[in-house]
């Protein structure tokens, strides 16, 4: 029987979602045919001539094998499948062929979940698997296992953005959450009802600008990381997170929780690479993972794993910018497990107070609403009606002139940094400043491309205000290690000053257990004390700070708390009846 092409299938071909030329029909393996006569259209298998008494078998509904896919290294082969569900909605899935070797049930589940009929019998499903293995479409496509930039194209499920596209590019990664690519309303509606409400509200402006950071990270040569809004539950943090999510799609799909394990980070990061990852309520992350999970997200690389046949699997990579909320900060959560974030963690995941200090939670301007609750309710209502339109417009315009955007981004970052980050700030503050500058540049670019309807300069001013608040909250422009060292010294003396130290001028000696040192009055005032610490006591302070003894000494000398010796190390003091102490 001749191959029959269903009108249903022709509709898919004439409206190719990839936007490129329609590929020729695939070469059909012997015995298989498309059939659209009667009530059971789809893929059928005719019985072999030697199988007397056998009937033709329906394997699946109508679908199209649009292209054969593989990654840039020539591995990860698969098929780009397209079909329409019973309601007429088009679906597309880049199926890895490796799934046919051991996870066929997942293949049938994915296709059935998208509304494609799949025969129930094991025999029929095995013949369908044979078809998918044997089918050789004429078109080829590059398949990627993460969203984002690939050879000049920005690849999202169902669409690749970029000019002069010579080859199809498709997403062939882990299945995405339902609704992730959904949209509702218009860009103009989103601008008027959501983006405009960020005027006068720096924290909302920060979150909306941050939603555009992902696609420009490569252009700015920026490392991964994120921002964390910390504060009370009723302050409006989650509403800001939902507003940011509305740039890309429905908040129900884009806003996730921190309730994940270190093993789940890789697929989540790959699904949100160079887009936006929204994570609500930090306290849902297990304290034992408080250090490793944020680090992995920012670091951009998966753990190396061994193949069963020997050698390492290809290491998954991503570039993620994430927004987070929670009542606790990362250091607070890590402390519950007796851990401390590694140096630089507070720059990879910048902690920002959610409370704006105006008595209105995160809000400062209510835009004619009577109170903060009414403003948040109106904004949440708007978020439910307007989403998923801003990111496609941004990507389309960004990809059309990627080189021009790169120049604008870098100039914006340099300008903002020069205006807001002091040259004598610590390296840690300067790194944080670059993170804030990146967010400001993203907001500025989105405005220039006509996606954010803000007045000129608002993104830069709003982000500058929050950077200044962040610097003040951390105690200045110094390194956080200095603050930890000083806190440890201050806490040690406050706790043990009377019990473990002996006064050198005391007329009456008393036993000192677990001695930490001595004290004496300073000259000429005599009202202040000078503390002489033993080497073991200094090591105890360093352990509390989580720093080397030399690093604590350096911080104490810089603060004027420790009198240095000739080599800028701690000064040695000789006491009668005691060995020399440092």
What are these regions (language model features)?
Residues 164-250, 436:
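P-loop NTPase catalytic core of nucleic-acid-dependent motor ATPases
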């Amino acid at each position: 029987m001749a191959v029959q092409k269903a009108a249903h299938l022709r509709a898919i071909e004439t409206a190719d979602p990839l936007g490129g030329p329609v590929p020729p029909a695939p070469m059909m393996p012997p015995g298989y045919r498309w059939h659209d006569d009667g009530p059971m259209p789809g893929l059928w298998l005719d019985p072999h001539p030697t199988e007397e008494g056998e009937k033709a078998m329906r394997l699946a509904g109508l679908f199209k094998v649009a292209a054969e896919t593989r990654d840039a290294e020539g591995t990860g082969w698969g098929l780009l499948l397209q079909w329409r569900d019973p309601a007429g909605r088009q679906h597309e899935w880049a199926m890895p062929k490796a799934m046919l070797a051991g996870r066929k049930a997942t293949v049938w589940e994915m296709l059935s979940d998208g509304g494609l009929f799949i025969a129930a019998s094991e025999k029929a499903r095995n013949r369908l698997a044979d078809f998918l293995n044997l089918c050789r479409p004429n078109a080829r496509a590059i398949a990627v296992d993460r969203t984002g930039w690939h050879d000049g194209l920005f690849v999202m499920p169902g669409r690749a953005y970029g000019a002069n596209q010579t080859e199809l590019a498709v997403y062939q990664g882990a299945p995405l959450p339902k609704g992730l690519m959904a949209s509702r309303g218009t860009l103009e509606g989103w601008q008027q009802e959501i983006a405009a409400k960020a005027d006068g509200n720096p924290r909302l402006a920060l979150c909306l600008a941050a939603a555009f950071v992902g696609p420009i990270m490569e252009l700015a040569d920026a490392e991964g990381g994120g921002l964390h809004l910390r504060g009370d539950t009723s302050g409006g943090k989650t509403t800001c997170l939902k507003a940011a999510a509305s740039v890309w799609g429905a908040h129900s799909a884009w806003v996730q929780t921190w309730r994940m394990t270190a093993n789940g980070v890789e697929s989540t990061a790959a699904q949100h690479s160079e887009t936006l990852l929204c994570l609500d309520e930090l306290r849902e992350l297990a304290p034992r993972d408080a250090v490793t999970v944020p680090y992995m997200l920012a670091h951009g690389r998966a753990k190396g794993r061994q193949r069963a046949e020997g050698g390492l699997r290809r290491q998954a990579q991503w570039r993620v910018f994430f927004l987070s909320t929670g009542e606790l900060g990362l250091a607070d959560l890590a402390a519950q497990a007796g851990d401390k974030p590694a140096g630089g963690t507070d720059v990879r995941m910048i902690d920002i107070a959610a409370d704006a200090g105006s008595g209105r939670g995160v809000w400062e301007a209510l835009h004619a609403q009577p109170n903060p609750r009414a403003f948040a309710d109106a904004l949440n209502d708007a978020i439910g009606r307007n989403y998923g339109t801003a990111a496609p417009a941004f990507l389309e315009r960004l990809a059309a002139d990627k080189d021009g955007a790169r120049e604008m981004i870098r100039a914006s970052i340099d300008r903002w940094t020069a205006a807001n980050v002091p040259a004598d700030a610590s390296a840690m503050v300067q790194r944080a400043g670059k993170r804030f500058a990146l967010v400001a540049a993203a907001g500025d670019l989105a405005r220039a491309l006509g996606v954010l309807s803000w007045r000129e300069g608002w993104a830069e001013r709003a982000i500058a205000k929050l950077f200044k608040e962040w610097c003040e909250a951390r105690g200045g422009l110094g390194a956080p290690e200095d603050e930890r060292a000083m806190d440890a010294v201050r806490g040690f003396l406050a706790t043990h000053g009377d019990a473990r130290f002996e006064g050198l001028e005391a007329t009456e000696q008393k036993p000192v257990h677990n001695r930490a040192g001595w004290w004496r009055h300073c000259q000429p005032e005599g009202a202040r004390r000078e503390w002489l610490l033993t080497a073991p006591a200094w090591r105890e302070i360093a352990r509390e700070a989580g720093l080397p003894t030399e690093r604590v000494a350096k911080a104490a000398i810089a603060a004027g708390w420790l009198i240095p010796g000739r080599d800028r190390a701690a000064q040695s003091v000789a006491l009668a009846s005691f060995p020399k102490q440092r």
